[in-house]
Amino acid sequence: MYSSVSKLWTWQFSLIILITISFYLCLQMLTGGFSIFVTELSHNPTLGGVMTTAFMLAAIITRPVTGILMHKINIKKVLCVMLLFVLVCIMISYGQQVIPLLISLRILEGIGFGVTTTLLATLATNLIPEERMGEGIGYFGMATSLGTTLGPMIALSILHSFSFKFLLFITMFLIVVSFGFSLFIKIKQSSSFAESPIKKESLVDFVFDKRAMLPCFLVMLFYCTYSGIVNFINGLGEEEHLGSKVSLFFLIIAVVIVLVRPFSGKIYDQMGHKYLIYPASICSIIGLILIAFAHGLTTFSIAAVLYGIAYSVMQPSFQAWAVSRVTADKKGTANAMSLSSMDLGMALGAPVLGGVASLTGYRGMYSLSSLLIVVLILMYMARHLKDIKEQKA
């Protein structure tokens, strides 16, 4: 699928990046927008978190099925169908205020999200040369992260200046753009998922590979903290009377991602993930604590820079680590596990941290969420020390 072993930026890889940015931007605008819309509609932050949880759990359940069928489906056709499916779901939600119906639609959108993102990740990793896997996944991760960070920011800005209906209209347009780009995808039988023999395996073997478990669990912990930011940063901003300025948090993260990702991918390939995970963890802890104690836009912005550095490094490093630990025919499985772990972190973080916020306030919640990163770095350190001992033995 690529003309040169060492070439990364082929036309097809660039196309996948464009589709990924557009699709993630759409879905994350909906994630941030639905949470705020339902919270204001019901005057219940927990219901706002349920909207995110329903969406993410649907994606988590869907991904293993996608991994099982990866060898049997026409990826381009399924991708196009799922994009149209998500478009129809958004159209139905336009003008609706019945919360059970909106939750049901979010579940359906989660199914579309789970299938589509797994297909895009597998297409991308099969286009990336092995010797540039860290760099390639870094760029793919930048595409997903730009959508993930800019989406909530744009949603906040639109809701402050326009309406939820206008936000839905914009997301419909983005899905149409993604669909248009997807028509130009070319799938050849030389892809690793096409040329790898299909082995007789149990259901568990199809959807799970223990070699990818640790990086997937660690990225889940990180995304629990990010869920707290996506779903509740607006509430903290209202307490501090920042208004629409709170959306700058996501803009700063997006800028940091663009600046950091190209370098972090090369560091991963040349030096390994340990030179990225340790400093990123420290930045994340400091960033969350600064959010908790921020009393103005300056401290808020510094927190965004530090957390943005962590976000820029964590997601692609753990995903590349997971993919590198499995065989070629299990790349789809590793990608599905990694993406499902991110979704699980978002799904668990929303209601759990929402409950914590109800007890301690938003500041207490962000302070306590930093403990998740402490657990992450301790588990990573334990694995790192174990690897060192095994190398010396």
Predicted regions, residues:
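Structural signature of the two symmetry-related core transmembrane helices
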Residues: 77-91, 275-289
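Helix-loop boundary and gating motifs at the non-cytosolic
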Residues: 9-49, 226-235
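C-terminal membrane-cytosol helix-exit motif in multi-pass small-molecule transporters
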Residues: 172-192, 379-383
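Juxtamembrane intracellular "pre-TM" segments in multi-pass secondary transporters
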Residues: 1-9, 187-216
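Helix-to-loop junctions at the C-terminal end of transmembrane segments
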Residues: 62-74, 261-272
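Paired small-residue
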Residues: 100-108, 298-306
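Cytoplasmic helix-loop-helix junction between adjacent transmembrane helices
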Residues: 107-143
